Amino acid sequence: MEHVKESINFKLRGKSYNLSVDDVVSSMKGIRPDGILKYYVRIGDMDYPPKQVLSESLGIQRISFTTKDAYDILTRLGFVVEE
């Protein structure tokens, strides 16, 4: 993974957030990946669905954002979302 930025500020459905690479990585420690439907993000040696990663990292429900939202935010941080 090539990190573009250490942290980013963004709005998601009208709410402001700040998220760092370290926030994402630490939030996924000890979390088992859900099944991969189409896209995945590799964190450590595990592949996770992008929505699971963003949900765990922000502490919000997956229904409150799209896979494209997760893709855009994670790629801005430098994570690679693969198919």
Give, region by region, the residue ranges found by the protein language model:
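Terminal leader/tail segments of proteins
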Residues: M1-E83
